[in-house]
Amino acid sequence: MLAAFTRRTSFLLILLMLVAATQLGWAHAILKDSTPKANSSVTGPDVGITVRFNVRIDGGRSRLHLIAPDGASLPLTIAKQDSPDTLQSQAKGLKPGAYKLIWNVLASDGHMSKGEIPFTVN
């Protein structure tokens, strides 16, 4: 009886460890790096945009847009992905002021993640 209990307990512990280990690979997208960096100042009027994440990103289902100093939302076209964890775009004709880059990305785990990067154009 004790041997059966020990076997069952061992099996359940191994199963639990396997499930926990597989979940480590299913993390939501976390921003690792960006250009421009958060709270930085950049020279305009044209600004290159790059956001890099900790996981693969579906560029076709992800979105980037800017919130301009006047509150207008400016959608950005995402360039063809050179790297599966990176999105790039180009913001043209930006006037001086405070902007927010808003990102909404579909990660490899199937979950949407979002965030914002404030920066200033000189």
Language-model segments: what does each one mean?
Residues 83-88:
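Aromatic sugar-binding surface patches on proteins
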Residues 40-44, 48-52, 110-122:
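Extended, polar beta-sheet/loop recognition surfaces of beta-rich domains
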Residues 11-22:
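Bacterial N-terminal signal peptides
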Residues 49-74:
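Short, surface-exposed alpha-helix to beta-strand junction/turn motifs within ectodomains of secreted
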Residues 27-45:
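N-terminal edge beta-strand
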Residues 2-12:
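Bacterial N-terminal signal peptides that target proteins for export
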